[in-house]
Amino acid sequence: METVLNHPLFMPVLVTLVIIAAFPLVAGYIVLVERKVLADFQVRLGPMRCGPHGLLQPIADALKLLLKEDIIPTDSDKAIFWFAPCISTITGLVAFAVIPFARKIYVADVNVGLLVISATSAVGILGIILGGWSSNSHYSLLGALRSAAQLVSYEVALAFALLSGVMVAGTLSMQGIVQSQADRGVWGIFANYGFMVVPFVLYIIAATAETNRAPFDLPEAESELVAGFHTEYSGFRWALYFLAEYANIFVISSVAVTLFWGGWLRPFSSVAWLEKPLNYGVPVILFVGSGLLTFTLIRKVVDPMQQKVLLGVVVLLVLIGAIMAIPMVNDAMIGLFWFLVKVSVIIYTMIWFRGTFPRYRYDQLMNIGWKIAIPVGMASVMVNAVLGMLGKH
């Protein structure tokens, strides 16, 4: 057993299996959080029927999608129609291979990891284009063409934002980028006298557009294109596009955290006396406090079964908080904790965009991409180059 645990392939294989097994569930609960947050913005409750406070809604949605009839349009290109969603989903999941979730939790440390993620995101758009074209529908084709044009427009700005981060870190390796921030003792967003805030904001805008999220969701604008590129999809194949979208959201959030927010590093990582308060106090207070807050909701639930489910959630949260107080467990998992907290903040920000901003017109979308985002990206690269040279002298 010890030989297996010490094998160099053990951790990569384990992380891969966990990602494949857990991501559909994680994506489902990201959707639940999105629905709850948007409901809160609109002074509503959101899903409340399935389980206490809607906690089982993602499972109900998954069962519904798996049991729905899978309809294939008569005049569609059936082979491509079937395969297109798989392209988007597979490329979305492949990007997870080079993301460092913690110091020792990753699948592969590739020396061009950032380039791999950029390549997979570009290839993933083929799934959308092929899906829209093979559907033999005007709505789907227009949505696919919009998606392609949007990718071309914002991929350049995204590349400039990433290039600024790479210039500061001095490497394309995702592990190396985090290590460079650890060596400097400051997150990437504060590098070059704080100017890296500009590439960070540019990255968030361009990445939101590239993943077709609101307010840049023109490829699936329901008021114009019914459902855009996946108008003709239903059931399991539609669910694959759905998984691909949320896989890409998680990936771009992970890249933002790795490049600009220190990856798995805790806040103020260079301040030694804050290590125990942040690494032990924050997770314990967060999980135990969430458990106690959930406990206060039990008496508001009438159904005995839902009360038992909530009680189980309370026990689980308190147990996780207690386990995180164990030094050996904390040392192994604290990096993953901070990484997921930071990623959650980015995802919440993207949900906030959806609930706040109206959808742009197509000409406005192109103007922002070509006349604002790309020039700002080019300028930020040049300014960061100058500041980097000044910092060395």
Curated annotation (Swiss-Prot):
Question: What are the annotated disulfide bridges?
Answer: none
Gene that specifies this protein: nuoH2
Note the topology in the membrane. Multi-pass membrane protein
Upper taxonomic lineage: Bacteria, Pseudomonadati, Acidobacteriota, Terriglobia, Bryobacterales
Membrane-spanning residues: 13-33, 79-99, 112-132, 158-178, 186-206, 240-260, 278-298, 309-329, 333-353, 368-388
Q: Where in the cell is it found?
A: Cell inner membrane
> Might you give the EC number(s) for this enzyme?
7.1.1.-
Q: Which reaction does it catalyse?
A: a quinone + NADH + 5 H(+)(in) = a quinol + NAD(+) + 4 H(+)(out)
Task: Name the major location.
Answer: membrane
Question: A GO biological process this protein is involved in?
Answer: aerobic respiration
Broadest EC class assigned to this enzyme: translocase
Its biological purpose is as follows: NDH-1 shuttles electrons from NADH, via FMN and iron-sulfur (Fe-S) centers, to quinones in the respiratory chain. The immediate electron acceptor for the enzyme in this species is believed to be ubiquinone. Couples the redox reaction to proton translocation (for every two electrons transferred, four hydrogen ions are translocated across the cytoplasmic membrane), and thus conserves the redox energy in a proton gradient. This subunit may bind ubiquinone.
What keywords would UniProt list here?
A: Cell inner membrane, Cell membrane, Membrane, NAD, Quinone, Translocase, Transmembrane, Transmembrane helix, Ubiquinone
Subunit composition and interactions: NDH-1 is composed of 14 different subunits. Subunits NuoA, H, J, K, L, M, N constitute the membrane sector of the complex.
One GO CC term on file:
plasma membrane
Q: Which GO terms describe its molecular function?
A: NADH dehydrogenase activity; oxidoreductase activity, acting on NAD(P)H, quinone or similar compound as acceptor; quinone binding
| Family membership noted in the UniProt record | Belongs to the complex I subunit 1 family.
What is the protein's name according to its record? NADH-quinone oxidoreductase subunit H 2
